UniProtKB/Swiss-Prot annotation:
Family annotation (InterPro entries): Rhodanese-like_dom, Rhodanese-like_dom_sf, TrhO, TRHO_N
GO molecular function: oxidoreductase activity, acting on paired donors, with incorporation or reduction of molecular oxygen
Protein name stated in the entry: tRNA uridine(34) hydroxylase
A Pfam family matched in the record: UPF0176_N
Recorded family membership: Belongs to the TrhO family.
EC number: 1.14.-.-
Function statement: Catalyzes oxygen-dependent 5-hydroxyuridine (ho5U) modification at position 34 in tRNAs.
Catalytic activity: uridine(34) in tRNA + AH2 + O2 = 5-hydroxyuridine(34) in tRNA + A + H2O
BP term (GO), one: tRNA modification
Active-site residues from the entry: 193
Region described as Disordered: spans on this chain: 301-321
Gene3D superfamilies according to UniProt: 3.30.70.100, Rhodanese-like domain
Amino acid sequence: MPDHGMSRLLVAAFYAFTPLDDDQREALLSALPTQASHGAVLGSVLVAKEGVNGTISGPEQGVEGLLEHLQEQLKLGEQHFERLEVKRSWAERSVFRRFKARRKKEIVTMGVTGVDPRANVGTYVDPEDWNGLVDDPDTLVIDTRNHYETAIGSFDGAIDPGTDSFRDFPHWAETKLRPLIDETAPKRIAMFCTGGIRCEKASSYLQHQGFGEVHHLRGGILKYLEQVPEEESRWRGECFVFDQRVALNHQLEPGEHSLCHACGLPLSPEQRSLPSYIKGVQCLHCIDRFSESDRQRFAMRQRQMDQLSSASSKKSDDFSL
């Protein structure tokens, strides 16, 4: 775990599946921005009938204060199905530009009614027990994340569904996974995602649809990277995150990937060195996707961003004098 001195900011990814009525949701949506402002916390929190899901960053005291506020308001306990699941990491600077609390139909969008992890969910697997499970040849390991996430890192031998969004998972499960299970007859399924929320909902779906014995990694990849030593790890590559860090390495520090600001996909240093890459304008993934007028507009935007960055750096240098 990296040193988190006074200059570092705490980043917390969290979720809880807990039923919220209209009054509870409105109370949270009203109180969270005030709580965040008092603690200098930035980020995003989704509030729905099924619970809360968010990632926030800021001074440690402010972030922990907001998490405590959520724990109290939601009246959560310590059972798997009712706790506020939190993954913590650190950053040198803010990874968000603002704070938003938003009302949503689902805290992670699958688009299937009747899926409730509180009522029906797979077996939770702690990070220290994950290696033994996935090393078993009778275990079918599934990465429930999107294709652009799996492209930069995953567990050894995991199946990549190749989805564009989590909404695609049920269709993939019915059209690809079910025939695969019929053919190979694995003893169990083991699933994982970034922080645990998607695989928890996916395992609930598979259980409900009769896919057999289903397990999922508690706390997701982030908790695994936090608790399992790198020399014992089955993880390969970097873990995509939905904030300005883009990806994290095994030490939960910002990795080497950055986003193409034209298409939004992550790029490795090698991909950024290709002739097809023009910063802010195009990359190997989108070179044929946009029109010439689009690329001119992207180039103008990049020049403006570079000018703002240069001006900001000059102000910092002047202040340091």
